[in-house]
Amino acid sequence: MLVWRRPMPGHAAGTQTQALAGDEGSGQRDFGVAVVVGAAPGLVASWPAEAITQQVAPDLPGFAVEVLPEIDSTNSELMRRIRAGWRQPLLLVAERQTAGRGRLGRQWFSGDAGAAPGTVPGASANPVLASLTFSLALALAPRDWSGLSLAVGLSVARSLHPALQLKWPNDVWLQDRKLAGILIETGSVAEHRYAVVGIGINIAPRDGTQLATAPACLQELLPALDAPALLLRLVPALVQTLQCFEGQGFAPFQAAFQARDALRGRDIVLSDGSTGTAAGVDATGALLVHTSAGMKVITSAEVSVRPSRPLAGAAAPGIPGTPGMGS
């Protein structure tokens, strides 16, 4: 594994270390001030753990980065650690997930590490990871948790490209196709509440023939951006978003979300079979839907939403990719 924790005074950065025997289990672990930078045994990519920590740690004391070649689920692992008493903010990255989870319990498949070079024109000729999957655990105490997944999605979209849109409540879309998904869970340790924010992003094209709609991939927009560079671009902005949300809730993000709302003005079908026209979101992040019975406010995490028809002018499905977290 790769681990980075901000060095303490009197300790030099760049010290290489191996994980302690038996420390792969759940629970609180003490990595001290040890540092592993760059490639580590079992990892395909060289990860910018130090650069991320230098940007994040001043605003998030105790912040650490951990990268694993493979795990069942980054969200599941962080939830296990929280239940075992973990208290430090931690970014956990996995090059491969074997039992990834999405919203409403759906399975999420991460791309195999070391995937073949992308076939999108302009993509890097170097081997790439087909997807980026990571989870961030940190103490969070907002007055209202409503709209958190929307704020996280907005942070991802803002960090990447103006063309990206947001599908309520937890997806990032490119031309009506899913590019990324978000899964947020919470847990408690003593008097503190912790959030685990999981994000999965499709990077390279993959076989999408078994999916109803083939997902988008980041190489269509940013062919030179690989998983480590993508992580460095996303995480500092994500931490700032979470801290802003903790203090002010969703309201400061509402207007920016509306500008990227993929559903607004479109006929949609709810998971209960009812239909209506999406009318944006309110200051808490609730979905507003015009129905024959009047305005309906959708807040339940158990409600799924899909357009009743494709967006006019959107690219036709057919570019293969890797499904993202949630739905």
Question: Can you say where each PLM-predicted feature lies in the sequence?
Answer:
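Long, positively charged amphipathic alpha-helical accessory segments at protein N-termini or as interdomain linkers
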Residues: 2-10, 14, 31-45, 51, ...
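N-terminal lobe of the biotin/lipoate ligase/transferase fold
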Residues: 2-159, 224, 312, 317-327
